[in-house]
Amino acid sequence: MLFRCKCDMMNTLQKLPFPGMNAGKRSEIKGRNPMNLLILTSIILSVILGVSRMVDLALFTDAETGLCVVGSVWLRYAALAVAILLAVAAGRAAKPEARKLCSPCKPSGVMAVLGAGFMAATFVAKLALWDSSVVGRIIMAFLSLSCSAWLLALGRSWMSKSWKRPSDDLTHVVLGTAVFYWCVLARFMENSSSWHRVAPTVVVWQMLAALVFLSVLGRALSLPDTADSRTLCASGLTVWALCLCWEFPQLLDTLLRGGVLARLPDFFFGLGLCCIGVLGGICAVRTTRTESGRKSARHSVG
């Protein structure tokens, strides 16, 4: 009986709200700023979009023409519209802070360096493989190289122990994103198609999304006081949806069908887009999260 009373007393003491411990727990919980639910929903929905795209390419799309053989083409556009609208809404509704990107971050740096490598591979492949459009090939090659240099500068900034601005002005940003301007123009000049072929149409959306994201990102890193944080977050989620979740299934389908060598420059460029998509998702999460509250909790307990 006495032993039971002692156990009950110990349990009661453990549950008492001691000031130091309770304040620490409150500080820790408050310091943990979980990912915005809308942003998390957008990321998950984009992944579902990618899985659906993989199934669509494997079963419901003609491999030769790119035309839909089962279901309406407008169902594909509707799914894309939902993913894009949710990404934009999540980014605009959140309270991101672009300044949080001005600090070392190894995942961001790795993705930027990988993207730079694939863009450099696009440059080499464009010059090595001969095609009929000599002028367009050369322009695309050197613009890809410029984009590679810009992404490499971003990667070095994020992977260095002490943060350094990748550029003090926006000249490098303009040169680094010019390839996406060119891709939009080339899509209409060289390979225009009807709305019934989803992939060529969505390429334009991908280029515009990457252009907006990298432009706003470059401004946020070079001129933090003039950054548009909400546009940065929204465009980051959009490139996650379009440049990663939509593009990767198409690259995987090309790889499985054995068409990589015939489209090697486009394949490398697509891999670069995927890296930009991952980078967009990382940046969107970083701008909306705060550091863990463990340090503040430790100080309050002490």
Language-model regions, residue ranges each:
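Canonical alpha-helical transmembrane segments
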Residues: 83-99, 149-159, 211-220
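Alpha-helical transmembrane segments of polytopic membrane proteins
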Residues: 68-84, 108-112, 122-126, 134-150, ...
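Juxtamembrane "helix-exit" motif on the non-cytosolic side of transmembrane helices
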Residues: 54-63, 123-132, 184-195, 247-258
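C-terminal transmembrane-bundle signature of multipass membrane proteins
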Residues: 39-57, 85-88, 203-302
